[in-house]
Amino acid sequence: MCVPGCGGTGKSQLIRAITAYFTQTNRVHKLRKLAPTLVAAAEIESMTIHSFLGEGRNRKKKSKTIDRPGQTKLENAWRFVEYIILDEMSMVGLSLLARLNKLVATAKHCDPMTTMGGINLILFRDYIQYSPVFDKPLYYNFSTTMDNNTTNNRKLSTENEIQQESAPALILQINCVVILEQQMRTKDLAYRALLDRVRNGEGIHEDWLLLRTRVVGIGLHISLNDPPWNQ
């Protein structure tokens, strides 16, 4: 499942509501919340994907967690989990998603062909935000690059490239998309229109003029034509 929406449409509130529902119904042990960054994880009271995978900043040290099907700690962590909320999906890369899929399949003792070990995956946020670092975004299309590489003498794929090329099959399993469109944070119609244009890279001169009026402090007018802003 995928729940996209621009800023201010209530995505974080929805995640909190889902968490509250699982807590009140005594099923919070069936829910896992993950995010690609520490800030995003703190926002929804979750943990980072890298921490959950047992990966530090130096990925040269391979995680021992993923390759041990009989590891009790790993099995206990996922024994009752049925739902994964994956926040900030724009920053989640294909390789990262593939590694998460491998870990869950190992923990659940599932066929590797079973998506996410049979667990329901719910992606949140907005594709039109920060892209993943040193990874391909979830919407990346390999068809063009594969055609080009076929004509050239393509080298053997690395483990990271294999993960990236296999992960799109996971995305294609999404069979439900709920788009959040109602803006809950901003009621100013002109400012909302500005945000929509800037989000899509379609800003106009009037947007710049409007932003110049959003100055903190009464009577404080600063020109962008004056130093140091014009440098």
For the regions a language model picked out, list residue spans one by one:
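Conserved ATP-binding/catalytic motifs of P-loop helicase motor domains
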Residues: 1-231
